[in-house]
A protein has these predicted regions:
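Amphipathic alpha-helical segments typified by the pilin-like N-terminal helix
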Residues: 2-46
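Short, well-structured segments within or immediately adjacent to enzyme catalytic domains
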Residues: 42-225
Length: 225
C-alpha cells in the first residue's frame, strides 16, 4: 500500500531553518539601522536649512540682528504669527524622541540651540560683528548630558532662548557625543547659512574644537564672533 503522506520536517531541519533566519536578521538589522540613521541625519539638515531661511528673513526685517532678546526667545520670534517659521515642529530634531505640540509652550519640544556667544547681556549682536561667517556656528542640536542622545529644551525656555556652546548644552551640562554615526557626527548651521556635518571631536575641524588652533586654525572663530 502506497503512503501518500508528505514527509514532516525533522527537529534538526527546523533548527537549521531557524538558525538561517536568525543569521539573516542579524545581517539585515545593521543595514536597516544605518539607513534609518541616514534618513534622520538628512531630515536634521533639512530642519537646520529651514531655520536658516527663517532666521535670514527675520534679520532682513530687523537690521541684520539675530533673534532673541531680554524679553523674547529666538524661537518665539521666528515663529511669531507663523511669519518666519510655519510650524514649531521644524524645531524638533528627528533624533528627539519626545512628543511635541504646536502650542509654543512647555509641551513644545525644542531640539536646536543658538550660539550663546551672539548675546551680550541677553542682547543679540548684528551679523556684521562675526569675523568669519564661514566657520562660526549659529545653530546646532542642543542635547542634554548623558551617554545617549536626548533633549530637554522646551518652547517656554527662559529668554533669550535655548543656547548651545561647543560641547555644552543649555539646559543640561556636558554632552558626550554627537547625534548620529555612533555619536561621532553632528550637523551644524553656520553664519554664512550653509549646513555641514561635523566630527564631534578630533585633530582637525570639529564641533568641540575651541582651543587647538595648531591643528584647526579656525578653532578660535568657531564659537566666538
Amino acid at each position: 500500500m502506497t503512503n501518500n503522506r508528505s514527509p514532516a520536517f525533522t527537529l534538526i531541519e527546523m533548527l537549521v531553518v531557524l538558525a538561517v533566519i536568525a543569521i539573516m536578521m542579524s545581517m539585515t538589522y545593521p543595514v536597516y539601522t544605518t539607513i534609518s540613521q541616514r534618513a534622520k541625519a538628512t531630515k536634521d539638515m533639512s530642519n537646520l536649512r529651514q531655520i536658516a531661511l527663517a532666521t535670514q528673513m527675520y534679520m532682513n526685517d530687523n537690521s541684520n540682528v539675530f533673534p532673541g532678546s531680554a524679553t523674547q526667545t529666538w524661537m518665539s520670534q521666528l515663529e511669531l504669527n507663523q511669519k518666519y517659521l510655519s510650524v514649531w515642529r521644524i524645531l524638533e530634531s528627528p533624533f528627539d524622541k519626545r512628543s511635541t505640540s504646536e502650542s509654543g509652550d512647555g509641551t513644545t519640544a525644542i531640539s536646536y540651540g543658538i550660539n550663546s556667544n551672539i548675546y551680550v547681556s541677553n542682547v543679540p549682536i548684528s551679523a556684521d560683528k562675526i569675523t568669519k561667517p564661514t566657520v562660526f556656528i549659529v545653530f546646532a542640536p542642543t542635547q542634554e548630558s548623558g551617554s545617549t542622545v536626548s533633549f530637554q529644551g522646551l518652547g517656554n525656555s527662559a529668554v533669550p532662548g535655548i543656547g548651545v556652546l561647543a560641547a555644552t548644552s543649555t539646559p543640561g551640562g556636558t554632552v558626550t557625543g554627537g547625534t548620529h554615526n555612533n555619536r561621532a557626527k553632528i550637523n551644524a548651521l553656520f553664519a554664512d547659512w550653509h549646513v555641514e556635518t561635523m566630527a564631534w571631536s578630533g585633530t582637525g575641524p570639529a564641533f568641540t574644537h575651541t582651543t587647538d588652533p595648531g591643528s584647526d586654525p579656525d578653532a578660535p572663530y568657531r564659537w566666538s564672533p
